[in-house]
């Protein structure tokens, strides 16, 4: 950690790195940032020497699900969170501008209670998140500021009633059950079960990408129009599409949020079904392959065995991408070469068989 770095680097990062004060967090609980997590000790009060940029902080107590947040740390910033033992979650604690200098002076007395950022994992973390910006975090992060693997669910019926109560303060709305309104609106699926959704404010605000069906999972499918609509929704910035792919991957890998995995798959599937875009969006596809290569390279082995390889999703989907690039007259030699190298790496590393015919 910090002690393994040259003293001058440690001194520089202490002066220019960010600080996270995580006050009141229970002892012997899980606390992590990016690629590293620990069991907290009795004196734990947070982290020091955090390199500027986007990081993912997460924690859990006992057998509770992980909760976390993304934050774009600035040089010298002091971010304060306070643990609420009653609600078992963290809350923001604002530091008034006129108290920042005093808070920085207090850090010296807290030094032994602050864990240094795990720099041995920083290169891997940066490689997983290099497209993610402060704008990405602001756009995607849940409004209530917490990412959780077990987000609070609410039925559409309950949500409808709650919204109606807000709009009609006298509570006399059509979903009230009384003599005048003996029946209320029901929201059920085809099996008669309540339709559930994540409560407003808790959802990760991913871009809407229609999933492809099994019948659409074949070479020759062309969905460049969907890709262009998605890019327009992102202000024409293809880097933000890759940023969303990266943030979705981290949400699943470190946040243990299954919807992150689903969004990651949807992006890969879409990118594999756009042969007409290979020439005009070559830079996007070149970077896409690099991002996916690094994600698969850094992924724990059990992640693949338990999740990615379960339904052969990647072999089936990437077979379409490899065939589209191979057969394209517009992809260009550099994209074809990079794709062929990626395919060979996957074949050698994971023994995957790509049927591109």
UniProtKB/Swiss-Prot annotation:
<dbReference type="InterPro" id="IPR038516">
    <property type="entry name" value="AAR2_N_sf"/>
</dbReference>
<protein>
    <recommendedName>
        <fullName>Protein AAR2 homolog</fullName>
    </recommendedName>
</protein>
<dbReference type="GO" id="GO:0000244">
    <property type="term" value="P:spliceosomal tri-snRNP complex assembly"/>
</dbReference>
<dbReference type="Pfam" id="PF20981">
    <property type="entry name" value="AAR2_1st"/>
</dbReference>
<dbReference type="InterPro" id="IPR033647">
    <property type="entry name" value="Aar2_N"/>
</dbReference>
<dbReference type="Pfam" id="PF05282">
    <property type="entry name" value="AAR2"/>
</dbReference>
<dbReference type="InterPro" id="IPR007946">
    <property type="entry name" value="AAR2"/>
</dbReference>
<dbReference type="InterPro" id="IPR033648">
    <property type="entry name" value="AAR2_C"/>
</dbReference>
<dbReference type="InterPro" id="IPR038514">
    <property type="entry name" value="AAR2_C_sf"/>
</dbReference>
<comment type="similarity">
    <text>Belongs to the AAR2 family.</text>
</comment>
């Amino acid at each position: 950690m910090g002690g393994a770095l040259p003293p001058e680097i440690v001194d520089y990062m202490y002066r220019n790195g960010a600080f996270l004060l995580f006050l009141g967090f229970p002892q012997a609980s899980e606390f992590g940032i990016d690629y590293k997590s620990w069991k907290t000790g009795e004196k734990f009060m947070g982290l020091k020497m955090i390199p500027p940029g986007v990081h993912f902080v997460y924690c859990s107590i006992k057998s509770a699900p992980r909760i976390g947040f993304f934050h774009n740390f600035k040089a010298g910033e002091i971010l304060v969170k306070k643990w609420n033992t009653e609600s078992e979650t963290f809350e923001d604690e604002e530091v008034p501008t006129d108290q920042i200098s005093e808070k920085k002076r207090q850090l010296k007395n807290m030094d032994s209670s602050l864990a240094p950022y795990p720099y041995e994992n920083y290169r891997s973390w940066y490689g997983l998140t290099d497209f993610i910006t402060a704008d990405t975090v602001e756009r995607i992060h849940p409004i209530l500021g917490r990412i959780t693997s077990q987000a609070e669910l609410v039925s559409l019926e309950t949500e409808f009633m709650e919204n109606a109560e807000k709009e009609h303060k006298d509570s006399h709305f059509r979903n009230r059950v009384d003599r005048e309104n003996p029946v209320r609106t029901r929201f059920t699926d085809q099996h008669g079960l309540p339709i559930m959704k994540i409560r407003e404010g808790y959802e990760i605000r991913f871009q809407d990408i229609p999933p492809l069906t099994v019948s659409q999972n074949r070479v020759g499918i062309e969905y460049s129009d969907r890709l262009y609509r998605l890019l327009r929704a992102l202000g024409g910035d293809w880097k933000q599409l890759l940023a969303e792919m990266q943030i979705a991957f981290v949400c699943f890998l470190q946040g243990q949020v299954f919807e992150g995995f689903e969004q990651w798959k949807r992006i890969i599937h879409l990118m594999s079904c756009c042969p007409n875009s290979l020439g005009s969006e070559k830079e996007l596809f070149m970077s896409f392959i690099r991002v996916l290569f690094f994600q698969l390279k850094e992924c724990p082995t059990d992640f693949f065995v338990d999740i990615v390889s379960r339904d052969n999703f990647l072999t089936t989907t990437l077979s379409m991408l490899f065939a589209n690039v191979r057969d394209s007259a517009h992809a260009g030699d550099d994209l074809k070469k990079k794709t062929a190298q990626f395919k060979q790496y996957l074949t050698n590393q994971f023994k995957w068989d790509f049927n591109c015919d």
